[in-house]
């Protein structure tokens, strides 16, 4: 074979290999940029924030998934299965309106969790055939000229998903981060609502995300007693 031809072929092959190498570098670089990077975090800060958030979640778990806000059987303010909320209870947790409830919720849970709560609990759920679930709580506006102040009303037929008492050990341990989520481990004590003598201890792994004004829970914190549970 002609030496000049061989040289040309060698140059072409070398050029192709160089191009392939450059392409590989570019692809590898883009892939690396697309990879999820585990965020850095201050362990003590996350653990301290978790303790506060868990106490808030204890109240919200009761309101959203537990027995709910107590109500009074005032027939003058009743509407179907809705009755006015107990003002004494609301005052004890610093809530007067649904907006107050949302404020506490948004100080506790991530945007994603808040969105799900609002869609499934604070809003009625509809299908093509009509309503399939009524909002658990509604804000009632009585008007400026009415002697009765605005109030929250409670849907009295809402299902109670979690009745057991849940307590969180303040000794929280930050474990790791996965992407933007930081995971912590907390020891949870669950006391059966049917028999206070029955107690279960579990390790619950909870995710947190950092938003503009602080940390938020990004996973549920409720728990249920199981008779046959073994730790």
Language model: regions and residue ranges:
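Gram-positive cell-envelope targeting signals
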Residues: 1-46, 56-57
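Mature, Sec-exported extracytoplasmic domains of Gram-positive
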Residues: 32-231
């Amino acid at each position: 074979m002609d030496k000049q031809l061989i040289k040309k072929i060698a140059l072409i092959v070398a050029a192709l290999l160089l191009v392939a190498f450059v392409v590989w570098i570019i692809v590898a670089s883009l892939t690396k940029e697309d990879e999820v990077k585990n965020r850095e975090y201050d362990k003590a800060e996350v653990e301290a924030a978790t303790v506060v958030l868990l106490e808030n979640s204890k109240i919200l778990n009761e309101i959203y998934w537990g027995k709910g806000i107590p109500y009074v059987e005032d027939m003058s303010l009743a509407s179907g299965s809705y009755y006015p909320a107990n003002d004494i209870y609301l005052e004890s947790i610093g809530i007067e309106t649904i907006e107050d409830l949302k404020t506490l919720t948004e100080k506790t849970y991530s945007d994603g969790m808040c969105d799900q709560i609002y869609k499934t609990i604070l809003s009625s759920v509809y299908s093509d055939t009509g309503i399939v679930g009524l909002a658990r709580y509604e804000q009632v506006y009585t008007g400026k000229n009415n002697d009765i102040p605005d109030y929250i009303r409670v849907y009295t037929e809402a299902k109670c998903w979690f009745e057991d008492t849940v307590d969180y050990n303040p000794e929280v341990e930050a474990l790791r981060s996965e992407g933007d989520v930081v995971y912590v481990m907390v020891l949870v004590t669950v006391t059966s609502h049917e028999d206070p003598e029955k107690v279960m201890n579990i390790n619950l792994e909870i995710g947190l995300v950092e938003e503009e004004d602080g940390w938020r829970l990004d996973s549920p914190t409720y728990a249920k007693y199981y008779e046959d549970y073994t730790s």
